[in-house]
Amino acid sequence: MIASEIFERGVQDPFCQDCDYEDETDVQSFLGSNDLNDFVNSKLASFSFQNSSKSNNSHHSSSTNAGNTSRHIGNHTIGHHLRKIKTAPHHLYGFVPANSTNNSNEPIRPSPRRIRANSSTLIHQLSRQSTRQSSLGDAADSCFDHKCIKPRSRHSSCYGIPTHLYGLEKYVSSELDSLAVANDQSNDLTSPLTSVSTPASNSNSYLNLNSSSAAYPSSYLSNEKNNRLKLISHGKISSNNVPGHSGNLNHYHRERTPSNLRRESFSLLSNGSSSSPLQTRNNSYSNSLVKSPSNSSLNTSVASSNEESIPHTSNCLEERNPRRKSFIKLSLASSFSN
């Protein structure tokens, strides 16, 4: 019954001191209110209250040793009460005689239940205070060191913060988008002009053709030219079967590889056709020169026409009409592409 009442009071009020004074009232009722016998005095004097101020390990070992001794004395008539007294020895300071060996100068400790109740809060307060002081001290030291170390700049508050990576993006992105749109519009406006201006000037297109055909050796081009002129001089190629490509720009931009040129020349030989005003002019000129019925005179006339007559006629045409220069070059390019 007593234990249940103590438990209930302890649960209802954890700071209640009646639980600690239950043993004291039992001892007072058993031993009497005023006189103590020698046995109780000797037992109370044998308790070493000085060991309570030592470390936790020594205090724990002394408590276990005392618990073992109390178990051995359990058969005595007052051993039960002595074991109960041991749970709260700080309330028995009035029973200790004046001639006892307890000469400690330490103050009387509060009740153990109150210590158990306040220990967590005390430790929490101490830990918070220590951490707060340490954090403040570290912050003060770090601020002092930071002031000494940081560079002298106008934006010292933003030192070490990468705001230029994230914070400024929303301000810069709109301007970048507007610039990109402006660039796209300018490109769209300039591209039709260039596309219109390219077919208008035949000289520019011929320059592009010359730049594309510059990769081939001049000897190969001269051989092709000589072969075509020989065919024209013999009259094996007529200019009436194949239409010209003077207006088709895609025809000039076709890839001109040696294999393609060889294939095209073979097709021309098989079809017996050519397409160029200059070739027709050269054909008529060579026919006018070739009048001899002998093969030797034909060969000599072809050689002379290949080596001397064509450059001479082109020079004469360029000297008479400079505007015909681009047309002649364009016709030569079309003949080579075929």
From Swiss-Prot:
Superkingdom of origin: Eukaryota
Modified residues (Phosphoserine): 119
Region (Disordered) location: 50-75, 267-318
Classification via InterPro entries: Mbr1
Keyword Cell wall biogenesis/degradation listed: no
UniProt keyword annotations, A-Z: Phosphoprotein
Extent of Polar residues compositional bias: 307-316
Keyword Mitochondrion belongs to the record: no
UniProt feature, compositional bias: Low complexity: 50-70, 267-306
Protein family according to the UniProt entry: Belongs to the ISF1/MBR1 family.
Described function: Could influence the NAM7/UPF1 function, possibly at the level of mRNA turnover. Participates in mitochondrial biogenesis.
Protein name as annotated: Increasing suppression factor 1
Organism: Saccharomyces cerevisiae (strain RM11-1a) (Baker's yeast)
Lineage summary: Eukaryota, Fungi, Dikarya, Ascomycota, Saccharomycotina
Gene: ISF1
